[in-house]
UniProtKB/Swiss-Prot annotation:
Residues 1-20 are annotated as: Disordered. This is Uncharacterized protein AN9274. The lineage of its organism: Eukaryota, Fungi, Dikarya, Ascomycota, Pezizomycotina. InterPro entries: NTF2-like_dom_sf (IPR032710), SnoaL-like (IPR037401). It comes from Emericella nidulans (strain FGSC A4 / ATCC 38163 / CBS 112.46 / NRRL 194 / M139). Belongs to the PEP2 family. It holds the Pfam family SnoaL_4.
Length: 238
């Protein structure tokens, strides 16, 4: 029987500091939480200048519909998608941060729900995906104005999702075989995105520990290892 209740050995950043810790790091973690929550709060409200403030200039992000892109390309794609009718919102549920003792690197995990409105065969539905953002933060002076926190990389764990009718009793016909061909953690979201947005969604996005033995399960473990490497001061490619 697979072990679905434990993280892979060696993935916990033992030297990082999290809850409690020195007061100066509590303040730093508060700054990082505000930055992490800025993704859903700023993006959903089209506050693009504020959204840009989350990132360092060379930051890279991953999402289901965009793939791996620079954050400015992600912003451009988000704007184009909105103009074409894409309606994506988020709900934030909680955040944790692991930070180095010298307050130069951190990883913030933000629990959230992605909720996207779709119209399929003239019927409105919401795909809702429970996920965790994973922000790789670094404090650096990138513009000559002094050190500041910014994201270098942003990824997600896509853990489970569902498809809901907007109007009770009205639900479009779903190709269940096609739906079940997608990764378990975000199959409803990707089904609707590919059907309506003209995109090809990546099939190996990180999932939940329960997805062990699948590509999403492998990427789940890899993302934890990358987070540890980041906090250990290593150079990584996400």
């Amino acid at each position: 029987m697979p072990n679905l209740h434990s993280l892979p050995l060696g993935t916990r950043p033992e030297n990082a500091i999290r809850n409690n810790g020195p007061d100066n790091l509590v303040l730093e973690r508060a700054k990082l939480r505000e930055l992490a929550e800025g993704w859903p709060c700023y993006r959903d409200a089209c506050e693009w200048e504020n959204f840009e403030s989350i990132f360092h200039p060379d930051a890279v992000v991953y999402t289901t519909w965009s793939g791996r892109v620079g954050y400015k390309d992600f912003i451009a794609g988000s704007k184009a998608g909105m103009d074409n009718g894409a309606f994506i919102m988020h709900r934030c549920h909680g955040a944790t941060t692991d930070i180095t003792a010298d307050a130069t690197r951190a990883v913030t995990k933000l629990k959230a729900t992605i909720t996207q409105r779709f119209v399929i065969d003239g019927i409105e539905v919401d795909a809702e995906a429970d996920c965790r953002f994973c922000f790789f933060f670094e404090k650096a002076d990138v513009d000559g104005k002094g050190p500041r926190w910014g994201a270098r990389f942003v990824r997600h764990w896509y853990e489970k999702d569902k498809l809901l009718p907007v109007v009770p009793g009205r639900f479009p016909k779903i190709d269940v075989d096609k739906l079940n061909s997608y990764p378990e953690g975000y199959k409803c979201l990707v089904y609707c995105q590919e059907l309506t947005m003209g995109v090809k969604v990546l099939q190996d996005m990180p999932g939940h520990r329960r997805h062990a033995g699948t590509l999403s399960g492998e990427k789940h473990d890899l993302l934890y290892r990358l987070a540890k490497d980041w906090l250990d001061g290593k150079e990584i490619d996400v």
